[in-house]
Structure formats: structure tokens, C-alpha cells
């Protein structure tokens, strides 16, 4: 288990750790103060690579991380946090991006459920439109960029109402000929993962992977009910309850859009 950074630690003479704000299997995310730009806070993502990898593969993974961090740094879209820096210290790699204040959509959904309410459809559709803008931008890059871990907790709403798609930990760049290159290894979250994403890095994924997760995320937000896992639906197609059977206030148009996005057979 990697030793965590401590509050007050300064990396690269610039980024002073404030506190940990997220943790995963490959590292942690910290809130940090940028000592060169007074008042600016940033999110510092620390990546600890699998030390059991052969030396050549480990080196390749690290070079790949830094190379593709450069790709992320070129992205400029209102619903994506800006990546501003990347570097390595010892065996760890770091990605610096905008810190996004506000609550994530999972928090808002759980609050509504505790109050025996559903999130208003018009609000969720507004968020969905912003998410669609972000995904269209990513998928239209050359080569296309996938997020691969779209879910309510990775969508943050700023105090001004701007939606941000956060956690680029599973971003994948699609190289020409559909050869896939993974920035940071990961397989997404089962509730929002389509069939084709199972199987790790050997699995076939393309932009439809994000579309499925988009639909599954909307399903969860609008019904306050976790969507059935794709593998279970494959064995039992009736396993997924239509959204309007849970939330009768939903429009038929929205239900159809969700079920279309969550189609098990994207072709």
C-alpha cells in the first residue's frame, strides 16, 4: 500500500498538499494549493503503478501515462476540468487538474431519496445535455477519447450550476485502427458498465461504452434505483425494470432515450 502524502507536503516546489479528497486502487486524489498562483486550488491525482509488473512493462506504462497526460492537457471544454501539469517523483506519477467545488450527483440523488422524492426530470435533462456536450467533445478528438467510468459520483455540480465530468483515471485514447491505449488501468463500475467492457484491457470498447454508462447514469438519477448489471441482463433480459414503472412522472421520450442508450447490443 503506497504511503499517503501528508498535509503540508510540497511537490515540485509548487503544489502544497491540503487534504486527501479521494482514494482508489491505484492511488489517491488530494486537494492542493498552487504556491505559484495565489488563491488557486487544484486536484492532484497520484498514480501508483503495479510494482509486480516486469521492469520493461512498468517503464512503458509510465511513459504512456506522461505521453497521454499531454493529450489531456490539450483538452479545453467547459464541462471538463482542465489538466494543467503532469510529472513523476520516484515510482509515482502525478496529474494536476482543476479542483471542482460542489456536490456530486450521487449526493443529490441520495438526498432526494431520503426525502422520498425523485430528482426533477428537467434538472436531470439539463445535466444530461451538459454531459452530452463533454462526451461529444471527447469522442470527436483525433483519436477519440473515452472516459470509461461515467457514473453519478463522477459528475459534480458547481455552485453556479455547471456540470463537470471528473476523474480522468480511466480515460482511454483510441489509436488509429481501433487499437486501444489505456492511460490508467481500470474497468469502470459494474452498474454502469456495458457487456463489451468486461474482460479488462482485452475487451473491445469504443464510444458506445460511454453511451451505455450515460444511459445507466440517467436511469439511476431519475429512478433512485441502481440499474441492473449488464451481465445479469444478458442472462435475463427482463431483469431491467423500465424507468417509468419506478418513476411514473417520467416522460416516455426520456424513458426511450435511456433504454436506447442501455441497449445490450450496440450494433
Predicted segments with their positions:
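AlphaC helix of the eukaryotic protein kinase fold
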Residues: 48-74
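Activation-segment/catalytic-loop signature of the eukaryotic protein kinase fold
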Residues: 86
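Conserved short submotifs of the Hanks-type protein kinase catalytic core
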Residues: 90-104, 108, 112
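C-terminal lobe helix-coil module of Hanks-type protein kinase domains
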Residues: 191-267
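Protein kinase catalytic-loop region centered on the HRD/HxD motif
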Residues: 131-145
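Conserved N-lobe loop of protein kinases adjacent to the ATP-binding glycine-rich P-loop
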Residues: 33-42
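Protein kinase glycine-rich loop
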Residues: 17-25, 29
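Activation segment signature within eukaryotic-like protein kinase domains
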Residues: 127-128
Amino acid at each position: 500500500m503506497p504511503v499517503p502524502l501528508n498535509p503540508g507536503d510540497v511537490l515540485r516546489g509548487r503544489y502544497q498538499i491540503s487534504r486527501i479528497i479521494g482514494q482508489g486502487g491505484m492511488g489517491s486524489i488530494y486537494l492542493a494549493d498552487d504556491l505559484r498562483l495565489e488563491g488557486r486550488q487544484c486536484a492532484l491525482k497520484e498514480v501508483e503503478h503495479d510494482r509486480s509488473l516486469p521492469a520493461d512493462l512498468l517503464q512503458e506504462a509510465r511513459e504512456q501515462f506522461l505521453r497521454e497526460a499531454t493529450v489531456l492537457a490539450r483538452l479545453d471544454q467547459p464541462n471538463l476540468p482542465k489538466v494543467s501539469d503532469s510529472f513523476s517523483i520516484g515510482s509515482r506519477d502525478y496529474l494536476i487538474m482543476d479542483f471542482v467545488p460542489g456536490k456530486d450527483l450521487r449526493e443529490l440523488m441520495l438526498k432526494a431519496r431520503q426525502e422520498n422524492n425523485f430528482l426533477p426530470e428537467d434538472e436531470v435533462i439539463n445535466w444530461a445535455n451538459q454531459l452530452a456536450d463533454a462526451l461529444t467533445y471527447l469522442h470527436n478528438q483525433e483519436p477519440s477519447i473515452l472516459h470509461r467510468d461515467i457514473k453519478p459520483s463522477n459528475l459534480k455540480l458547481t455552485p453556479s450550476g455547471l456540470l463537470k465530468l471528473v476523474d480522468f483515471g480511466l480515460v482511454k485514447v483510441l489509436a488509429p485502427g481501433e487499437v486501444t491505449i489505456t492511460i490508467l488501468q481500470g474497468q469502470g463500475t459494474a452498474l454502469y458498465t456495458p457487456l463489451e467492457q468486461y474482460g479488462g484491457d482485452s475487451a473491445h470498447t469504443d464510444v458506445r461504452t460511454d453511451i451505455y454508462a450515460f444511459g445507466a447514469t440517467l436511469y439511476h438519477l431519475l429512478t433512485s434505483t441502481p440499474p441492473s448489471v449488464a451481465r445479469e441482463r444478458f442472462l435475463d433480459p427482463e431483469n431491467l425494470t423500465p424507468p417509468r414503472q419506478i418513476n411514473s412522472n417520467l416522460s416516455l421520450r426520456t424513458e426511450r432515450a435511456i433504454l436506447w442508450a442501455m441497449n445490450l447490443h450496440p450494433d
